[in-house]
A protein has these predicted regions:
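N-terminal strand-loop-strand
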Residues: 1-27, 56, 60
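Charged phosphate-binding loop/patch that engages nucleotide di/tri-phosphates or the phosphate backbone
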Residues: 117-149
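Active-site-adjacent beta-strand/loop module that shapes the phosphate/pyrophosphate-binding cleft
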Residues: 5, 66-89, 100, 127
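Conserved Nudix-box catalytic region and its N-terminal flanking loop in Nudix hydrolases
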Residues: 13-50
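NUDIX/MutT-family hydrolases
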Residues: 81, 91-123
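A generic fold-level signal
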Residues: 2-4, 12, 72-75, 94-96, ...
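Short loop segments at secondary-structure junctions
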Residues: 14-16, 23, 83-88, 104-106
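Short alpha-helical functional segments enriched in proximate histidine and acidic residues
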Residues: 51, 55
Length: 149
């Protein structure tokens, strides 16, 4: 059985996570469908530009799981932790109903898949080390965005 793949990113702004409300009235992470032949990280950079008008640097892969979007309709979700690459203001595209930023303690009250909550908490734990700087992973090629993992 084949499933579509959706690449999502966790962006924390001043301790708050950026989320988008979809047509099912669920809050979700920015990102979208991986195109055939597309590098997953290039997909995420493209999706952040399309959905929020911002450029991002991909820092770490966080999680992967199978999500039942609708009854008997599944998608593989892959999440990454990201940081801003510029200072552009966040803007809402026509793909979503609303844009919101939420404190970590507000997540449990939101209609959203548990896997997204898990990814947000994982990135919050990784992103701020004792030194106050993001965790670093070794760089790998592929996406067109600058990455320093």
């Amino acid at each position: 059985m084949l499933f579509p793949v959706s690449i999502k990113g966790v962006l924390l702004e001043a301790g708050r996570v950026v989320l988008l409300e979809n047509e099912r009235e669920e809050w979700e992470l920015p990102g979208g469908r991986l195109e055939t032949g597309e590098d997953p990280m290039a997909c995420l950079v493209r999706e952040f530009a399309e959905e929020l008008g911002v450029s991002v640097i991909i820092k770490a892969i966080l999680d992967c799981w199978l999500y039942e979007v609708l009854p008997a309709r599944y998608v593989v979700i892959v999440t990454y932790g990201v940081e801003r690459a510029g200072v552009e203001a966040l803007r809402l595209s026509a793909e979503h109903r609303r844009l919101g930023t939420f404190a970590l303690d507000e997540l449990d009250g939101l209609p959203m898949p548990e896997g997204y909550r898990r990814s947000v908490r994982a990135w919050a734990a990784i992103a701020f080390t004792a030194k106050g700087s993001p965790a670093r992973l070794p760089e790998r090629g592929g996406a067109s965005a600058s990455r320093d993992f």
